[in-house]
């Protein structure tokens, strides 16, 4: 949030409903509402028993004041089928975050794969012919639910993207020192990073 949200952002796609990925939803909604011209985005059907509904119960309660307390966002459940979003095809693919299945996404020649420590066999074809791979790499030590830097570099070696950015990085990795030891086409991501 420190880098602000570009007022041109029209959609946010979530990989999974863990707290570190969804807890900024209210802030994102407020900033996007301020930039939005015209009516708010219509709401989709919301599943009352979902993790989203437990965390954001007020957003799923029809009695909550529509304009003041409920996010003015449409919630759409995503499966593994490709879908169109704002004229662009998004191709979801399965990743494993320990024993928890999560989603990665491919848009054009960019793939985003965070919070993962394994890539199932059926997902590898969606990582072929990439320009840019954004990949989880928590820190240097082994971890039960995240790739570490060495494992991420093995994935990058197999995928062969033109460039790669490591994301979901811990404070244990010094930005300058880590970038200095990475291959030239691999860098740590940073707040405010924009991919064309």
Residue ranges and their predicted role:
Residues 1-113, 179-196:
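Binuclear metal-dependent hydrolase catalytic cores
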Residues 7, 119-120:
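Short, surface-exposed beta-strand-loop junctions and turns on beta-sheet-rich folds
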Residues 92-93, 113-115, 135, 166-167:
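Thr-Gly-centered strand-to-loop micro-motif
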Residues 120-196:
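Binuclear metal-ion centers of metallo-dependent hydrolases, dominated by the metallo-beta-lactamase
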């Amino acid at each position: 949030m420190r880098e602000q949200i570009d007022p041109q952002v029209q959609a946010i796609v979530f990989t999974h409903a863990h707290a570190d990925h969804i807890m900024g939803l209210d802030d994102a909604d407020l900033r996007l509402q301020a930039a939005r011209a015209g009516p708010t985005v219509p709401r989709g059907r919301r599943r009352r028993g979902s993790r989203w509904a437990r965390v954001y119960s007020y957003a799923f309660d029809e009695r909550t004041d529509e304009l003041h307390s409920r996010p003015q966002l449409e919630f759409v459940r995503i499966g593994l089928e490709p879908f169109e979003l704002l004229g662009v095809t998004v191709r979801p693919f399965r990743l494993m975050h320990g024993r928890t299945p999560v989603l990665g996404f491919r848009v054009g020649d960019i793939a985003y794969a965070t919070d993962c420590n394994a890539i199932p066999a059926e997902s590898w074809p969606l990582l072929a012919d990439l320009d840019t791979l954004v990949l989880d790499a928590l820190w240097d030590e082994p971890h039960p639910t995240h790739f570490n830097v060495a494992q991420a570099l093995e994935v990058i070696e197999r995928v062969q993207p033109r460039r790669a950015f490591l994301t979901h990085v811990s404070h244990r990795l010094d930005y300058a020192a880590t970038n200095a030891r990475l291959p030239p086409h691999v860098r740590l991501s940073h707040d405010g990073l924009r991919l064309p």
